[in-house]
Each structure stands twice: as structure tokens, then as C-alpha cells.
């Protein structure tokens, strides 16, 4: 059994189509100034025909495998964090497994909404450290724009689509996930949800007419819960790793809303120049937001070998998750 699970590969994929705030001005009653002031978003990527969850996940997964220098046949486990699967079943991870060529590898989905990447990172790391898996391909992908009411300016301006992936392998040196704090409050499940389409409320013509197949969220309440839980779980994760915010080279938060990111950074007493932000170009990509940010942080050399990074997220459920990782790749 390994002491640690190092991140040896990473990759991302986003749709080709870019939807700007100027485009949205022509679709709903809104403005670039209104959107940027309230969210910090300038544009987002929108999935088109053929750019479904498995397709983006396969593209991100292939990029991560190439970076790790692994053949897909060496992967023994494929995990996908998503709440927008290709279809109710089978698990979309099985489609990803076949698509990347990881023949006969174990494959399963996990659902933790926007917290999915950190939740899945804990699962993947535990499998590697326990010896249950050796080479894990972990992908996070969501296509929320298929569940958006494009007449609702409060939600249609927020979301974008994308996928991010990492490869985890055993390591005897301190690397990868050092600590992780997961949490949820199911009593707040209705603050953000898609009501129709499950076994509680199967999609019927009447529910579709009511728009119950679209994302609903109580933004004001989400803001309060998000800032509180992201900050609290971040401090807990740092304490579990024996570190303080001063030891962290970079904070990589879930890219939901610039106001949430700024308020969380303030509670953590971390200057914004040590907080990675790219939601201005991608919007809220749900579970994919942290791995996409991670890939770009590495590309921009804001995360280097030996650095500690704090990942923190919050999502529907309500769920939250924070983790400390040590970057070991050169």
C-alpha cells in the first residue's frame, strides 16, 4: 500500500462555443455591467451537438493520460464526478472508460454537485492508498447549460460547461491529497436543485410546462451558506494537514461567483493575488471548475513542484468540501 497518491497527469476540455455577456444581452433583459458586477463572469462555454458529458470527459481524460505518460490500458479505475450524466444509467464513467480505452477498468460515477471534484479526489486517493487501485483516472464534468431556463436571467448568466481530469498514482513521497474535509446539510436540499426528472417527480408534460426541469437556486441563501462552510472547512483541512494559510501557495476555490470567492478569501485572510480565479472566462462549470482551474494554474506556473494548494468548494445538496494538496509534478 502507498502512503500517498500523487497527481501525475492533468487535462481539461471545454466546448468550442463561447457565449459572451453581449450575447446574453440580446437574449434576456440583462447587461454586461449587471452580470459582471454581480458575478464576475464575462463569458462562458456552451456545449453544442455531440459535446455531451462523456465526450468532454473523454477529451479531458485523454489529455490527463498523455501528461502522465500512461497508456489507457494501465488505468484500473475510472471515476467520474457529475450531476449531468449522459443518461440516468448506466454510469457515464463506463462510457468514458470505453472512450479512453481503459478496457475492463472499474468505472463509476459520484454525485456531489459543485463539490464533486474534492469528494472524488478523496475517493480516488483512498483507493490508491489502500491498494484497491493503482492508476486512477478521475474526471469531473458537468453540462449545466442543458438544464438552464434561458429566459431566467438570474440563472442563465451563471453557468458554463467543461471537464477537468487528473491521474493519480502511488507515491512514497508526500504528494497529492494531504487532508480533506467533506460535509453536507440535506435539510437545505431545496436551495439549489433540478426538481423534475427523478423518481420523486418523474418528468411529465405538466411539470415541464412549469419549468421544473430547470435549475432553481436561492442565490441569497446559497451565498451565506457557501462562504461560511467553505471558510470553516478550509480551516479544518489546513489544521488536519498541520498547515496555515501562510503555507499555501495558492487557493483554488470553486468558481461559482466572484463575490463568494472574495468573501471566502477575506474570511481566510488570504490576499486575492494568492487566489486563482478564471470564472470570468468559463462561468460556473460545477464539478469541473476546480480541475479546470488547477490545469490553468499549473500552465501559468502559479502552482509549482513542492507547493501546497488549498481546494475549497460548495454545491447543491447542500455539500461542501475542502482539501490540501501538495503538488509534486515538475
Swiss-Prot record:
Q: Where is the active site?
A: 114, 254, 284
Primary subcellular site in the record, as a coarse category: cytoplasm
Catalytic activity as recorded in UniProt: malonyl-[ACP] + acetyl-CoA + H(+) = 3-oxobutanoyl-[ACP] + CO2 + CoA
What Gene Ontology terms describe what this protein does at the molecular function level?
3-oxoacyl-[acyl-carrier-protein] synthase activity; beta-ketoacyl-acyl-carrier-protein synthase III activity
The places in or outside the cell where this protein is found are: Cytoplasm
The first-level EC class reads transferase
Q: Pathway membership of this protein? A: Lipid metabolism; fatty acid biosynthesis
Q: Which Pfam families match?
A: ACP_syn_III, ACP_syn_III_C
User: What Enzyme Commission number(s) appear in the record?
Assistant: 2.3.1.180
Q: Which UniProt keywords apply?
A: Acyltransferase, Cytoplasm, Fatty acid biosynthesis, Fatty acid metabolism, Lipid biosynthesis, Lipid metabolism, Multifunctional enzyme, Transferase
Listed under GO biological process in this entry are:
fatty acid biosynthetic process; secondary metabolite biosynthetic process
What subunit structure does UniProt give?
Answer: Homodimer.
Which HAMAP family does the record associate with it? Answer: FabH
| Function noted in UniProt | Catalyzes the condensation reaction of fatty acid synthesis by the addition to an acyl acceptor of two carbons from malonyl-ACP. Catalyzes the first condensation reaction which initiates fatty acid synthesis and may therefore play a role in governing the total rate of fatty acid production. Possesses both acetoacetyl-ACP synthase and acetyl transacylase activities. Its substrate specificity determines the biosynthesis of branched-chain and/or straight-chain of fatty acids.
Per the entry's comment, what about the domains? The last Arg residue of the ACP-binding site is essential for the weak association between ACP/AcpP and FabH.
Q: Which NCBIfam families match?
A: fabH, PRK09352.1
Which PANTHER family does this chain map to?
Answer: 3-OXOACYL-[ACYL-CARRIER-PROTEIN] SYNTHASE 3, BETA-KETOACYL-[ACYL-CARRIER-PROTEIN] SYNTHASE III
Protein name (Swiss-Prot/TrEMBL): Beta-ketoacyl-[acyl-carrier-protein] synthase III
